[in-house]
């Protein structure tokens, strides 16, 4: 083994010893039988998929994709500046701006890139900028802020009092931006959006909200928590994804014309990469349009979420209680979390990927359950029974959600 191979092997061995080694499952999703998939020639029920509403297989979206690929081909052919600025992506950007009631939008190849490159570029455009970021913001937000090398202040999770203290420490005339998520993907808690908006106004700051886990799911037309709270007009930059509730791929930001144009002209992560293919842009546009008009998917989704949480309450399964659709089951041990995930798959044909550090803090390792409108009462009952039996086999204690919430909160702020 070479010197360099030894370095890589030692790194992998360390991760394995901590129970954090990740193995990817070879899945074959069944578009005509959602949320089922095939894994090792066995049919399984998927409980951890981010295709929240099953829009990836919706007839309107699928047909639009077929029509687009026959008309435009598979790829986009280049960057937005050189050959890749197709009509389909322009139509998608118009649809996104309309969805969020903003003047303009800009589409990126992923939600990660949208956050990373936008935040870094804002710092390039405003060299004296100060970032204020929630301590549990997504890795893409952290990457953008850290990579910008701008001054940053990290406020305690969802703590607007601490945020205000930090804002007070910076000259009110200095450019600043508060960056936060509407819903946090690992615990499902909502941000105090209106309180943050009020602080931004008071201290002359821009607001940047990540609506990745809420667009399509909340609000009258699916525009997210800002729409639900009727405050979209008070937020400067809304970021979202096309890869979750809308069932496709890509990320975006929406804002006023001047901000979007400045990012378009300056963001390396936008300029120097091939654009989304027309087939994807077309599919996303049709998915957005459908969910703007139809509330049935959102209504059914919320009903399934409520049924799942009620079932977990009956079985005393220790999930982290929140008001969102994200249902984290806290295990608190990386080895047991991995074993629980494998037992669900191998013994019960249920797929729930375990989540360990560094995605979540040590001691809060978990199974994150993602309900969809397609999950049935029988599936909910099967999952609940399987979890109780696995908890018993692994000697994982059942506890009330109140006790769990208190315990996790202490871990998060430690």
From Swiss-Prot:
Range of residues in the leader sequence: none
Modification type N6-(pyridoxal phosphate)lysine: residues: 244
Protein name (database record): 5-aminolevulinate synthase
Organism phylogeny: Bacteria, Pseudomonadati, Pseudomonadota, Alphaproteobacteria, Rickettsiales
Catalytic activity: succinyl-CoA + glycine + H(+) = 5-aminolevulinate + CO2 + CoA
Active site (catalytic residues): 244
Gene that produces this protein: hemA
Assigned EC number: 2.3.1.37
Chain sites annotated for binding substrate: 22, 133, 152, 359
A Pfam family it matches: Aminotran_1_2
Family of the protein in this entry: Belongs to the class-II pyridoxal-phosphate-dependent aminotransferase family.
Pathway connected to this protein: Porphyrin-containing compound metabolism; protoporphyrin-IX biosynthesis; 5-aminolevulinate from glycine: step 1/1
Xref: Gene3D superfamilies: Aspartate Aminotransferase, domain 1 (3.90.1150.10), Type I PLP-dependent aspartate aminotransferase-like (Major domain) (3.40.640.10)
Cofactor(s) recorded in Swiss-Prot or TrEMBL: pyridoxal 5'-phosphate
């Amino acid at each position: 083994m070479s010197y360099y191979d030894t370095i890589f092997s030692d790194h992998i061995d360390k991760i394995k010893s901590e129970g954090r080694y990740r193995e990817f499952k070879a899945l074959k999703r069944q578009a005509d039988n959602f949320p089922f998939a095939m894994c090792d020639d066995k049919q399984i029920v998927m409980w951890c998929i981010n295709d929240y509403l099953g829009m990836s297989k919706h007839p309107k979206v699928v047909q639009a994709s077929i029509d687009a690929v026959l008309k435009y081909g598979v790829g986009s052919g280049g960057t937005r500046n050189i050959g890749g600025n197709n009509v389909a992506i322009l139509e998608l950007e118009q649809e996104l701006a309309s969805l969020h009631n903003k003047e303009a939008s800009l589409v990126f190849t992923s939600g990660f890139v949208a956050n990373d490159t936008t935040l870094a570029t804002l710092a390039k455009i405003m060299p004296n900028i100060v970032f204020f970021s929630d301590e549990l913001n997504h890795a893409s937000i952290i990457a953008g802020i850290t990579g910008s090398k701008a001054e940053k202040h990290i406020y305690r999770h969802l703590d607007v009092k601490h945020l205000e203290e930090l804002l007070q420490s910076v000259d009110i005339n200095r450019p600043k931006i508060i960056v936060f998520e509407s819903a946090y993907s690992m615990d499902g808690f909502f941000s105090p959006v209106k309180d943050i908006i009020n602080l931004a106004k008071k201290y002359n700051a821009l607001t940047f909200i990540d609506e990745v886990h809420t667009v399509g799911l909340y609000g009258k037309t699916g525009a997210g928590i800002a729409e639900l709270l009727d405050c979209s007009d008070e937020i400067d930059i809304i970021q979202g994804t096309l890869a979750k509730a809308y069932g496709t791929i890509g990320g975006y930001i929406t804002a006023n014309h001047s901000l979007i144009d400045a990012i378009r002209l300056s963001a390396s992560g936008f300029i120097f990469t091939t654009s989304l293919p027309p087939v994807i842009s077309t599919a996303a546009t049709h998915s957005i349009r459908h969910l703007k008009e139809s509330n049935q998917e959102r209504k059914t989704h919320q009903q399934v979420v409520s049924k799942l949480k009620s079932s977990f309450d009956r079985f005393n399964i220790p999930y982290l209680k929140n008001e969102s659709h994200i249902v984290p089951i806290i295990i608190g041990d990386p080895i047991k979390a991995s074993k629980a995930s494998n037992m669900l798959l191998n013994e019960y044909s249920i797929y729930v990927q375990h989540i360990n550090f560094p995605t979540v803090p040590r001691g809060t390792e978990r199974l994150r359950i993602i309900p969809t409108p397609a999950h049935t009462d029988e599936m909910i009952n099967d999952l609940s029974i399987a979890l109780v039996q696995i908890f018993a086999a692994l000697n994982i204690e059942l506890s009330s959600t109140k006790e769990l919430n208190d315990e996790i909160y202490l871990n998060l702020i430690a």
